[in-house]
């Protein structure tokens, strides 16, 4: 699966509009993840998962940084996220379905923060992009 030029442009444009709030976006997406899919909390037994906790904000920043890296390297997402893929597959052993859950939460967060810009086409482009990101993050499982 690959993005068309128009889809790449939409993904980069949306990220450009949200990048100044990227850490908050990552944190909000994680909060949505833990609220909607409470089973994902098992990967963070040592975290204070209450809204606004320093640990939640720190990990939200990491999520946002990874998405930002993928956007910056939109033509080579696999290269940009190779180390993160290995970490999640071999060390953290995160169930691959959780990346799809997080992708959904990121879509909802982007839509809620950019209602005028997150059109149906932008949603479709971001959904496809996050599917690529999820695929890259789970490719080491095979």
From Swiss-Prot:
A GO term for molecular function: heme binding
Xref: InterPro entries: Globin (IPR000971), Globin-like_sf (IPR009050), Globin/Proto (IPR012292), Hemoglobin_a-typ (IPR002338), Hemoglobin_oxygen_transport (IPR050056), Hemoglobin_zeta (IPR002340)
Alphabetical keyword list: Acetylation, Heme, Iron, Metal-binding, Oxygen transport, Phosphoprotein, Transport
Coiled-coil stretches: none
GO biological process: cellular oxidant detoxification; erythrocyte maturation; hydrogen peroxide catabolic process; negative regulation of transcription by RNA polymerase II
Source organism superkingdom: Eukaryota
Stretches that traverse the bilayer: none
Chain positions found as N-acetylserine: 2
Positions of heme b binding: 59, 88
Record keyword Cell membrane present: no
Family label: Belongs to the globin family.
Biological role stated in the UniProt entry: The zeta chain is an alpha-type chain of mammalian embryonic hemoglobin.
Subunit structure: Heterotetramer of two zeta chains and beta-type chains.
Protein name, entry field: Hemoglobin subunit zeta
Species, as recorded: Equus caballus
Gene giving rise to this polypeptide: HBZ1
């Amino acid at each position: 699966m690959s993005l068309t030029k128009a889809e790449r442009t939409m993904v980069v444009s949306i990220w450009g509009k949200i990048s100044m709030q990227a850490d908050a976006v990552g944190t909000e997406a994680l909060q949505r993840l833990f609220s909607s899919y409470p089973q994902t909390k098992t990967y963070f037994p040592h975290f204070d998962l209450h809204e606004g906790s320093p640990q939640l904000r720190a990990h939200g920043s990491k999520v946002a940084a990874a998405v930002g890296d993928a956007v910056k390297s939109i033509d080579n997402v696999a290269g940009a996220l190779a180390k993160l893929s290995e970490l999640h597959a071999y060390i953290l052993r995160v169930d691959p379905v959780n990346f799809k859950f997080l992708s959904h939460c990121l879509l909802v967060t982007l839509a809620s923060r950019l209602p005028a810009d997150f059109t149906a086409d932008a949603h479709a482009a971001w959904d496809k992009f996050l599917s690529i990101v999820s695929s890259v993050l789970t490719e080491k499982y095979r």
